[in-house]
């Protein structure tokens, strides 16, 4: 964004018609920076910032409130089923933990937690160790950190201008174990060695790395925000012993709670009634979803002036992009557990180029200015995609495909798309007050059958700058008043598919 000089949006029919079928929804013109007159100068910009939550979380019940509300829910359900109120109350006190919640984080036995009215009994306190372990947001979220550096330089004289920039962006995401970094560069050079010749080139490229967490969709079990919001406030992040202390691994680390614990005899005991075998913090630590993306864009042009009023322009642009995504789901917790771990890889390559030749004639006959343009353009697009999915890992924490034994899916495809266009435009201007424009364009698209590949599109537009008229000179509160009308047609091949006519 720091390399952008200006941005314009064209939505009227006359402007869009000149750009053909790819402009059916409008045109965005982006002008990047170039060298400015003067000696070589340098600029360094440094931005530092943090990400924090801007909107507070909804008010939520705490552990004690949740227990009492759960008791009332079970008691009312039993009354609805036909139990007397006192029988339903006794049933709720005796069975709330064993039948519904599965975990008692307080210092009294399961059946002694509540009084006859469903309130936690006197002396009921949370066991030590649990209070600090019920905040899932604290375990899953952090303050994100962003640092950005941009170094640029520019210079210009009568025959040339130069601009370059080098940028680096590094972000630590708001959700733990998410990150993004990008290295980018741009070079722009414009030369006018003689009066009748001008040429230039604009090159830019970037290298990006991103690590995202699971659960992009709001309903995903691995979505940190949904998980932390919906898990009951009595369920801890880690497993605890009967006295409330943390259960530790052989190397002394706290064990995450997958919704159950396994004793020495291999018997599993449930520790919660939701998100069993899911754990947003644990999954984000073990899983990986990394994307590496490289881009290169280049634009070159040359203007040749001849016979006083004529200009011949050759333009070309190229876009290259390569992206490689590697995703890994571990075999311990979450999506990969049932398949003994799984790996996914997506690779895509994209390239396009546009080549355009323009001949322009401009001449002034007194107050009458004529501008005539004829041009030819061709565009080529190629997209190559490959997808692979494997399961059953051999070694943990190794997302490479050769570490998995079962091929679940292997697919790929390639898309090719080409257009060719011939266009013409005539502009007329009288004393900068009255303007008339007529354009015609003939487009051919590879998306259509050869017998119906070409379409003709035209436009006409006019405007009257009323504020330039003599009768408006005395109106000081109006500095620009324009009446404009236009009509045009543009093609649209976006919905046709690349090979629809072959089916």
Task: List PLM regions with ranges.
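N-terminal periplasmic accessory domains that precede
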Residues: 17, 23-46, 149-151
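Transmembrane beta-barrel architecture of outer membranes
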Residues: 146-150, 180-186, 421, 455-459
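Outer-membrane beta-barrel initiation region
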Residues: 139-144, 153-157
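Surface-exposed loop/interface segments of Gram-negative outer-membrane beta-barrel transport/assembly proteins
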Residues: 37-132, 143, 173-178, 184, ...
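Transmembrane beta-strand segments that form the barrel wall of outer-membrane beta-barrel proteins
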Residues: 166-172, 436-445
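A generic beta-sheet turn/junction motif
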Residues: 23, 155-159, 168, 363-367, ...
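Residues on the lipid-exposed face of transmembrane beta-strands in outer-membrane beta-barrel proteins
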Residues: 32, 151-157, 185-191, 298-304, ...
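Short acidic/polar hinge/loop motifs at secondary-structure boundaries
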Residues: 1-11
């Amino acid at each position: 964004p720091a390399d952008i000089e200006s941005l314009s949006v064209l939505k009227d029919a006359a402007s869009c018609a000149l750009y053909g079928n790819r402009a059916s929804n409008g045109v965005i013109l982006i002008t990047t920076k170039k060298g400015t007159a003067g000696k070589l100068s340098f600029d360094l910009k440094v931005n530092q910032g943090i990400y924090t939550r801007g909107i507070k979380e909804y008010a939520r019940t705490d552990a004690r409130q949740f227990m009492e509300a759960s008791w009332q829910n079970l008691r009312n359900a039993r009354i609805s089923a036909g139990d007397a109120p006192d029988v339903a109350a006794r049933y709720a006190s005796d069975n709330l933990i064993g039948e519904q919640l599965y975990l008692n984080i307080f210092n009294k036995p399961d059946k002694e937690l509540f009084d006859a009215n469903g309130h936690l009994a006197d002396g009921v306190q949370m066991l030590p160790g649990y209070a600090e372990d019920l905040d899932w947001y604290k375990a899953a979220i952090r303050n994100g950190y962003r640092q950005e550096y941009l170094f640029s330089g520019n210079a210009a004289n009568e025959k040339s201008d130069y601009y370059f920039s080098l940028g680096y962006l590094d972000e630590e995401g708001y959700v733990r174990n998410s990150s993004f970094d990008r290295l980018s560069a741009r070079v722009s050079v414009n030369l006018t060695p003689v009066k009748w010749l001008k040429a230039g080139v604009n090159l830019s490229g970037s290298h990006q790395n991103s690590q995202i967490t699971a659960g992009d969709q709001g309903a995903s079990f691995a979505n940190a925000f949904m998980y932390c919001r919906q898990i009951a406030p009595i369920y801890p992040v880690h497993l605890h012993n009967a006295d409330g202390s943390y259960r530790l691994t052989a190397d002394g680390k706290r064990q995450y709670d997958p919704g159950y614990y396994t004793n020495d005899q291999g018997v599993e005991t449930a520790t919660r009634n939701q998100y069993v075998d899911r754990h947003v913090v644990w999954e984000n630590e073990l899983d990986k979803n990394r994307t590496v993306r490289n881009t290169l864009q280049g634009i070159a042009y040359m203007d040749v002036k001849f016979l006083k009023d004529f200009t011949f322009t050759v333009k070309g642009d190229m876009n290259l992009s390569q992206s490689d995504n590697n995703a890994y789901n571990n075999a311990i917790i979450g999506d990969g557990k049932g398949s003994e771990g799984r790996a996914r890889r997506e690779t895509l390559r994209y390239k396009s180029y546009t080549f355009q030749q323009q001949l322009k004639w401009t001449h002034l006959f007194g107050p009458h200015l004529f501008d005539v343009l004829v041009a030819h353009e061709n565009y080529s697009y190629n997209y190559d995609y490959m997808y692979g999915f494997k399961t059953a890992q051999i070694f943990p924490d190794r997302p490479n495909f050769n570490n998995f034994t079962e091929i679940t899916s292997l697919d790929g495809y390639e898309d090719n798309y080409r257009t060719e266009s011939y266009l013409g435009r005539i502009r007329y201007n009288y004393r900068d007050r009255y303007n008339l424009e007529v354009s015609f364009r003939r487009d051919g698209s590879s998306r259509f059958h050869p017998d119906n590949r070409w379409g003709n599109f035209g436009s006409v537009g006019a405007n009257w700058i009323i504020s330039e008229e003599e009768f408006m000179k005395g109106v000081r509160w109006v500095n620009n008043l324009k009446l404009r009308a236009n009509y045009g047609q543009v093609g649209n091949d976006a919905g046709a598919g690349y090979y629809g006519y072959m089916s």
